[in-house]
C-alpha cells in the first residue's frame, strides 16, 4: 500500500514538473534599444609587407563618439530562449595629421588631412538555458547560462588627397556567460543583468549589461541601464585592434 502511495506521489511530481504551464510556456517579443556609449580604441593594419602604425582612433584621427541603435527579437519555450540582435556602428572623423601613419601598406604624411571611417554591423545569436526559473504571484527569480556568437562585419577606411585605402573586417566571436533576472511587484518592475565573454590566443572579448525595466501595461516594457563592450583581437589577418564601448542605454520591448 505504501509502495503504491509513494509511486503515485512520484508520478504526480513528475507530471507537475514536466507538464506544468511554465515547463512549456511560449514567449516571444521584439525590442528597440538606443545606446549612448563613450568610445576608445587603438588600431593597427599591416599590408604589403609593411608594419602599420598603432593608431589611437580618437587622438590621431579625430574619431568621435556616436550613438548606436539596435533591434532584437527573441523566442522562448519553457526554460529555453533564443535571441537574435542587430546593431550598426558608424564612426567617423577628420583630422590634419601631426604624425606619420602607415595603414594597410600606405603612408599618410604629417600635415595630410585625413578623413576616416569605421563601419561595422554587429549580429548576435544567443541561446540561454534557465537553470533556475522561480515565479510566484508577487516576485520571481531566474538564472541562466548563455552560449552566444557575436559577428562583426565591416570595414575601416582612411582617405586623403593622395591615398584612399580600406581594410575589411570579418570577425566571429564565440562567447559564454550568465544571465539573471529578479522580478518584483507582480512582474511590473524587474532588475536584469547579463555578461558574456571569451578569451583565447591573446584575444579577449566581453559584453555586459544591467538594467531596470518597467511594465506599465501588459505586453509593453520600458527599460534603461548601462552596457560595456570590449574587443581585443589580433586574429584577423593583418589587423590588430582594441576597442572599448561603455555607456547608458534605453529601450522599448513588446512581448507576448
Describe the predicted segments one by one:
Residues 22-27, 132-142, 185-189, 219:
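Short loop/turn motifs that connect adjacent beta-strands in outer-membrane beta-barrel proteins
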Residues 23-89, 251, 255:
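Short glycine/proline- and aromatic-enriched beta-strand/turn motifs that initiate or cap beta-hairpins
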Residues 28, 67-71, 121-125, 143, ...:
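Hydrophobic, lipid-facing positions within transmembrane beta-strands of outer-membrane proteins
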Residues 40-66, 88-122, 152-171, 199-200, ...:
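Extracellular/periplasm-exposed beta-strand and loop segments of Gram-negative cell-envelope proteins
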Residues 137, 172, 196-207:
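Solvent-exposed loop/turn segments connecting transmembrane beta-strands
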Residues 188-203, 228:
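Transmembrane beta-strand segments that form the barrel wall of outer-membrane beta-barrel proteins
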Residues 204, 208-255:
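Predominantly the C-terminal beta-signal and adjacent terminal strand-loop region
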Amino acid at each position: 500500500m505504501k509502495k503504491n502511495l509513494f509511486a503515485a506521489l512520484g508520478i504526480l511530481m513528475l507530471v507537475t514538473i514536466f507538464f506544468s504551464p511554465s515547463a512549456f510556456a511560449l514567449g516571444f517579443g521584439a525590442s528597440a534599444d538606443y545606446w549612448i556609449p563613450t568610445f576608445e580604441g587603438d588600431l593597427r593594419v599591416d599590408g604589403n609587407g609593411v608594419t602599420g602604425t598603432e593608431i589611437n582612433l580618437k587622438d590621431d584621427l579625430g574619431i568621435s563618439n556616436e550613438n548606436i541603435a539596435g533591434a532584437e527579437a527573441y523566442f522562448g519555450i519553457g526554460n529555453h530562449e533564443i535571441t537574435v540582435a542587430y546593431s550598426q556602428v558608424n564612426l567617423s572623423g577628420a583630422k590634419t595629421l601631426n604624425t606619420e601613419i602607415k595603414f594597410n601598406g600606405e603612408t599618410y604624411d604629417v600635415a595630410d588631412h585625413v578623413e576616416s571611417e569605421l563601419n561595422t554591423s554587429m549580429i548576435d545569436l544567443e541561446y540561454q538555458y534557465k537553470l533556475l526559473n522561480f515565479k510566484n504571484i508577487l516576485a520571481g527569480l531566474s538564472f541562466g547560462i548563455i552560449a552566444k556568437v557575436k559577428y562583426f562585419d565591416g570595414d575601416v577606411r582612411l582617405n586623403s588627397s593622395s591615398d584612399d585605402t580600406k581594410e575589411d573586417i570579418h570577425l566571429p566571436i564565440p562567447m559564454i556567460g550568465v544571465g539573471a533576472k529578479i522580478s518584483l511587484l507582480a512582474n511590473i518592475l524587474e532588475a536584469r543583468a547579463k555578461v558574456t565573454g571569451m578569451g583565447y590566443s591573446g584575444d579577449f572579448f566581453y559584453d555586459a549589461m544591467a538594467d531596470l525595466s518597467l511594465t506599465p501595461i501588459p505586453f509593453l516594457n520600458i527599460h534603461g541601464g548601462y552596457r560595456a563592450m570590449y574587443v581585443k583581437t589580433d586574429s584577423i589577418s593583418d589587423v590588430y585592434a582594441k576597442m572599448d564601448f561603455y555607456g547608458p542605454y534605453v529601450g522599448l520591448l513588446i512581448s507576448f
